[in-house]
Every structure is written in C-alpha cells, then in structure tokens.
Amino acid sequence: MIELSSEARAIVEGRHSDPFHYLGRHRENDRQVVRAYLPEASDVRVVDEHGGETTLTRIHDAGLFLGDLPNGAKRYRLRARFGADTVELEDPYRFPPILSDFDLYLLGEGTDQRLYDKLGAHPITMDGVGGTGFVVLAPNARAVAVVGDFNCWDRRRHPMRVRGNGYWELFIPGAQTGDRYKFAITDKSGSLLPLKSDPMAFAAEVRPNTASIVVDEAALPCPTPAAATINARRAPISIYEVHLGSWRRGDDNRWLSYRELADTLPRYASSLGFTHIELMPVNEHPFDGSWGYQPTGLYAPTSRFGSPDDFAHLVDACHREGLGVLLDWVPGHFPDDPHGLGHFDGTAFYEHANPLQGRHLDWDTLIYNYGRTEVVNFLVANALFWLDRYGLDGLRVDAVASMLYLDYSRAEGGWIPNKHGGRENLEAIAFLRRFNREVFAKFPHATTIAEESTAWPQVSRPIEFGGLGFGYKWNMGWMHDTLDYIGKDPIYRKHHHGQILFGLHYAFSENFILPLSHDEVVHEKRSILGRMPGDDWQRFANLRAYYAFMFGHPGKKLMFMGAEFGQEREWNHDHALDWHLLDQARHQGVQAVVRDLNALYRDVPALHELDCDPAGFEWIMANDADRSVFAWMRKGESGRARCLVIANFTPTVHRSYRVRVPFAGKWREALNTDSAHYGGSNVGNNGVVETLDGVIPELSLTLPPLAVIFLVPERA
C-alpha cells in the first residue's frame, strides 16, 4: 500500500471539505490520473470514451484507487466489482460545479428569491449525464456527505465539496426522482451528527420515517390561477378552514389522498358559497398532534396524503371551482427532532444558541434566528415558493405575537431585551416586513394574513407608514368577546351589552378577518354549538343568530370545518367530522343558513365592499341593552347600497319595533335566521316591510326570537 497523504487520509476518514481537490481526474506532470474512492470495491477500472480500459491500483484498504487515464481522453466511467457484481459508474468527481459564482454572490447577500431553484435536490443533466444535484447550507460543518438509495446509505461514498459561504454541493449521476436521501454531517469537532433531512426537500417519507425524497419540482403542472380580485379589500371573502387529515376519512379511518379530497372538498366548499379554502399546515411534520404547526419540511407538502403532484392537483381543483387557496404558514418556530433543523451543522444555525432567545417555552420548540441573513432568506423564499410553484393565493402566518415580543410567555429575567432595552423583537419585525414586501411585489394579487393576538399597532397597514404590511389580520378580540357574550344565558346578556359594542370601537383599525377557527373548538373549549346556552331549540337558534351576526358585522369571515353544520363535539384530528349529523333537520338548517349567508354576503355589496372602511358601517340602535337588540346599517360604495341588520339575542319576540332607515319605501327581508327553512319558529315580516308615513323614514318590524334579520331597500 502507498503511504497516504494527509489529503487522502482526510478522504478516507470522511473529513475532507473539498473531495474534488483529490478525487476525480487530475493532471500530474505529463500524466492524467484518476483517483476514486469506492469502499467495498475489490477491483476498479477506468474506461474512456473510446473504450480504452485501465486498471486502477488499490492504494488503501478502505477503497481508495489510483491510476492513469490515457492522454487525450475527455470522458470516462468507472467499472467496479462489488463481490460477484460488476457495475459501471459515472464518477461524480469529474463534473463541474453546480452553483455559479453569481449564485454564490446572491446566496451570500441573502437576496435570492428563488432559493428553491438552487438548494435542495434537483434532477439535472450535466455533460450529457442524468442525475441529481444536491446543495445544502451547513457553514459550520467539517464535512458533509449525501446518503441515500443510490449508495446503500453509505456515508463514505459521496462526500460533498464546500463552496463559498458554507454551501455544500455534489452532482450524483444516476440519482433520480423517487430516491430517498439525507445528509451525513460531521461537525467541527469531528463528531458525526444524526442524519439530517434536507431543509429544502420538496418531498419526504411518511412519518415515522424521515428521509427526504428527490422530486423534480420544476416539472409540477402550472396551476390554474384564481381570479385576480379574489383577495381584494372590496371583495367578499369567506374562508373555510380545513384540516385535510380529518375533514373526511376513508374506510378503516384512513386518510383521504389529495386527489380524493380534490374530488369532493372544493365542490363542497363552493356549494356552500365559501370563497376560499384555508389549509392548516401541509408542510411536512413528524407529529400528527401538532396539526402541522411544528414543521420539519417547509418546502414539502406532507406525504401523508400523496405526492407534490397530487397536492398541486388539489390546488388546481379548488381554483377550477372558483376558490382561492390559503395556507397556514409557520415561520415562528420549529421542532427539535434529531433529523430536523435544530443543531443542523453542529451549531445553533437556524435557531438562537441562547435558550432565552432560541426556545419557545409554550411549545418546547426552537425559534428561528431572524438576525441571520441565510435564515431570513430561507423563510422568505419558502413563502414565495408556495405562491410560485403551487399557485397558492395567500399565506396565513401563525403565532405572529410570539415572534414580535421577546418576552412572549416568559417570566421576568427569562428573556433578553433588544438593543434599545425594549421587548420588541426588532429582527422579527424586519423579517415580517421583508416577507410582506417581497410577497406583494412578486405576487400582487396574493394576500398575507396575520394571526396576531395582541394590540400591536398597524399589523395590516403599509410598511411605508410604519405598519407590518400584512393584507389582513385575524380579529381575535372580536372572537373572544362575542363568543363569551353568545355563551351566556339570554337573561344575563343585557349586562354584557358592551361586549358586542366594544368591537366596533376598533373594527377599522386593521383590515380584519373574523375568525371562528380550529383553536376555538379544542382543549375543552367545546364546539361552537356546544357553547350555546338553553335547550336544543335555543342552542340552534343562538348558533344561527351568531353566524348571521358575524356575516352582518364588518370584516371578512372565517369558519372552521364542521361549524357550518353544527358539529356537536370538539374537533379531533384523528377522526373525521360527524357528517352523520346532517341526517337531522336541525343540522341541515344550520348548513342551509350558512349557505344562504354566504350567498347574501356575496350578492349584497353593502355587506362586503366596505368591510374594512368605517364608511361602511353605522349604528342604528346600539343602546337597547334591556332587550339585547342591536341594529346597524351596512353600506356599499354606491349611494343606495344599504343593508339593515337587526339582531335580537333574547328568546322574546319584539313586535312593532321601530327602526330608522335612510330611504322611504319598501325594504325586503333578505334573510331571517328564524325561518322555518332553517329550523326556526318562522316569526318575521312576511318578506317585505314598507316605511311608515312621516318626515323621517321608519320601519315597524317584528323581531323574531334569538334571530338576526337582514333587510335591503327595494331597487337598491
């Protein structure tokens, strides 16, 4: 055996950061030599493009081979014997770099919006040879190798080379779509880390397995676009929030696939008049019980329900039904599973090293380091990826409050102030603004939505005016106050009248969405129906009235699956919704009123055009606490676009109830939640009411019990 150089020993010991410097073809004086590292091979020969063959000398028992390549040969292959098998291989170390110098410049600047075109695993052809290019960021690693189906998961076979700024790359001939792979990383001290999934993987194995899967994501079908105005401030936006794993299930409680869901979900949501479907996170995640909110694969649709192509089919099916598709997106934290982002290159790279900054106490997860350029680029590019590759129409950003505050859920002394001594996370603020700026610049018809549970100002206001730049914000205060109010016995509601009024004091401070989300039907909070007081008749009447109150209130709408037909029990992610309830008339009535409310909201401009504008709302009756009656006028952009909404939150019928209106003449009762069609007592105003004689136009109305009525002027 030849005495090994230090470089050769580094190859054999798996700690070489640039194996191309030693392996492959090299000129030494007047010779062309080939070095190959093929552990377990007993014999290796080099075959040039002319058919010439040279036997390489084994220079180390670990599988290091050396020999001459005939002068003038430009291409060659390796013919190796493994036991009784002889295979012919392309040498990965004869190919040029994957990343260009300009690529490395953009990556170093952290401004590459299409990071996903360069990092990860991409099937490509180099020098006429098909294979897969692998690129991963691990700046603090001593060595990185690719392991997978193509090399028997042998970390010795395919060491990568490091380029500028810690990007490691390798083209592996023959690696193809469908191959599983991971990265084998050696840290600075020489210790082997647990095998890591690719942070940029476009697909992964079904849990509990954690390997990444090679996918040609550039070949995904071009999505059918949604209408350009679907997210507009003046448009009706009614969102159906869905957890794909529990909306419906198949035989033996199995998950439905993306394609099975595509056959039913879009048509169902569209038939009820919803304008959007919001998907709880589909990013790959290891734990079902996280509902997707602890992702390890931000670029991969979960394989629980199928392939990336299958997911694209579902999005396309939604668009063909006229639905926008929103995705819950989690850039605030990630789990510390060994195969994931935590301690990725042997250091706290994606997360903060200090647990006072880097660990989320509520969820025992890791917090992204928004001060690191590469991490911010990774996250922003991920947002753009979903809008670009899958044609999604918007992103709902989860847990924004936990990102904005350094002391979120932390006791005194358990957090580190910012450079000004404050509690605001300045780096997270900068990240959110950059995220919104780049999303709207590249996808002007998309939207972004913040789940922000505090009074942080200007969340949905322009960045140039000091805002965070979101398109919309969930109105968590409205949700908490109104659910608390409607959950009280009607006899006590007069003492809590202000809970309804208070929301209108700030209803136009943001572009609000009124959310009845999944968070309100778990953890012993009960279902929305389960919160309603009284006997069965009153519970269902309360529910119908509450939904109508929401649709009459300023703000866009969101309803979690199951609420639309009065799901009785809390949501359980391990089981389908209780669809059998629709065999009962009272649940059919709830579904019918939701369908009609969506239609009314869409068809009456006054109910949606000025959802986010104070000009679109006027109190008509706000101080009738004794009777728990509220009346208000919704207004559209045109002069006669009006809709009168009156809510009676007691079981008492109020007759001859006088309400002032802006126009004399006939007003049509457009919807009455007490209609027998919905399971109500059918008290109402016989379809049309005419104003009384007098200087000021007034209506004399019958207010049905525990009900909301909508009236619009004839010829409006």
From Swiss-Prot:
Keywords: Carbohydrate metabolism, Glycogen biosynthesis, Glycogen metabolism, Glycosyltransferase, Transferase. It catalyses: Transfers a segment of a (1->4)-alpha-D-glucan chain to a primary hydroxy group in a similar glucan chain. The active site is at residues 398, 451. The keyword DNA repair does not apply. SUPFAM superfamilies: (Trans)glycosidases, E set domains, Glycosyl hydrolase domain. CDD domains: AmyAc_Glg_BE, E_set_GBE_prok_N. One of its GO terms (molecular function) is cation binding. One of its GO terms (biological process) is glycogen biosynthetic process. It comes from the Bacteria. Pfam families: Alpha-amylase, Alpha-amylase_C, CBM_48, GlgB_N. Pathway: Glycan biosynthesis; glycogen biosynthesis. Gene3D superfamilies: Glycosidases (3.20.20.80), Golgi alpha-mannosidase II (2.60.40.1180), Immunoglobulins (2.60.40.10). Signal peptide: none annotated. Catalyzes the formation of the alpha-1,6-glucosidic linkages in glycogen by scission of a 1,4-alpha-linked oligosaccharide from growing alpha-1,4-glucan chains and the subsequent attachment of the oligosaccharide to the alpha-1,6 position. Monomer. Belongs to the glycosyl hydrolase 13 family. GlgB subfamily. This is 1,4-alpha-glucan branching enzyme GlgB. It comes from Nitrobacter hamburgensis (strain DSM 10229 / NCIMB 13809 / X14).
